[in-house]
């Protein structure tokens, strides 16, 4: 057996050349396009990103355009992708790039790594794919491939395992095609060396070099450290109407969903009488309350269990911003947690 060694390089490149996925950021691997795609793909499936990527590039085709964009524009383009700190860091980095690098990404791994929101994987991907630098790009897919190749039972979330994997793949980088090798490893993990006990070993171009396969462990690898249980928060979410206008609230600038617009909500699951009393105490002039279908939304560390209530007011409520349905649709980015409740406004 071979495990992670130079023997995997040529079979992977040949397999990649024979038929990798046609993705919009691969057809034109300019630095900006690679960078944006890698940020979008963090915590998000490829199929979900395709449409977002095309819309983003049409609206903000280069770094100066992103740097000059208003927050409402780039957050609206990001609406539904979640993890909004990613898009804010993209904008911060674009401003910095215009100030220090003439609106271009530097062809240097360490300088890429110093940009807001750019970690080792993203820096390695941009450096190798866009600039041809021989550095690894190790994401979750690649960590899984490495664990199976080596029959390694170290949890892939272990910092030492990640560091060793980066070092080992760095030693394999071909000087002429580092980006393609990185992409072939990502492609293998995304399409063949699948997670959750479902590897398609018979379709793998490096099956003959895989220690995990030959020892019968591919389906049980990789190991992950036990996840901490998510905290559950009960909330009462309000779809507020005053005439033809919809009431929104902006979240604090720090914390979960920082700075985003949202449907107002109250802690806990409130009964109709409790809710009416709470809103009256807040100075709201309530005409009608109507219960909506409950919903749940899962964040990384917390779950929201939400009871929805349609609230019709006689007068605008204090501390809310009222917008038209068209403005809500076109100009305000609402987190996907509220999607099922916003759909009530379209009925």
List each model region and its residues:
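Catalytic cores of DNA base-excision repair glycosylases
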Residues: 3-4, 9-202, 206-219, 285
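Intrinsically disordered, low-complexity, charged terminal extensions of DNA damage-control enzymes
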Residues: 1-22, 27, 190-347
């Amino acid at each position: 057996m071979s495990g992670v060694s130079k023997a995997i390089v040529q079979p992977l490149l040949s397999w990649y050349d024979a038929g990798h996925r046609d993705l919009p950021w691969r057809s034109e691997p300019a630095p900006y396009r690679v960078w944006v795609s890698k940020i979008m793909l963090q915590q998000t499936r490829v199929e979900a990103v395709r449409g977002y990527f095309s819309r983003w590039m049409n609206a903000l085709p280069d770094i100066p355009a992103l740097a000059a964009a208003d927050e409402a524009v780039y957050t609206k383009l990001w609406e539904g992708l979640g993890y909004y700190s990613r898009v804010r860091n993209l904008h911060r980095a674009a401003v910095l790039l215009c100030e220090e690098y003439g609106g271009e990404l530097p062809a240097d791994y360490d300088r890429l790594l110093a940009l807001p929101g750019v970690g080792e994987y993203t820096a390695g991907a941009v450096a190798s794919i866009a600039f041809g630098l021989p550095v690894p790009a190790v994401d979750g897919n690649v960590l899984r491939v490495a664990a199976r190749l080596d029959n390694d039972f170290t949890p892939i979330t272990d910092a030492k395992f990640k560091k060793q994997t980066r070092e080992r793949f760095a030693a394999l980088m071909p000087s002429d095609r580092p980006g393609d090798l990185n992409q072939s490893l990502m492609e293998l993990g995304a399409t063949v060396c699948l997670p959750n006990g479902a590897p398609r070993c018979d379709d793998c171009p490096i099956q003959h070099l895989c220690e995990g396969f030959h020892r019968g462990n591919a389906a049980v690898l990789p190991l992950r450290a036990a996840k901490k249980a998510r905290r559950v928060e009960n909330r009462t979410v309000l779809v507020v109407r005053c005439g033809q206008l919809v009431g929104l609230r902006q979240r604090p600038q720090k914390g979960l969903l920082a700075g985003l617009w949202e449907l107002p909500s109250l802690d806990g699951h409130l009964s109709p009488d409790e809710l009416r009393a709470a809103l009256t105490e807040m100075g709201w002039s309530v005409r009608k309350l109507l219960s909506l279908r409950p919903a749940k939304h899962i964040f990384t560390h917390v779950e929201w269990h939400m009871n929805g209530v349609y609230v019709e007011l006689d007068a605008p409520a204090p501390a809310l911003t009222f917008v038209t349905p068209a403005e809500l649709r076109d100009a305000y980015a609402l987190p996907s947690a509220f999607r099922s409740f916003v759909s009530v406004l379209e009925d």
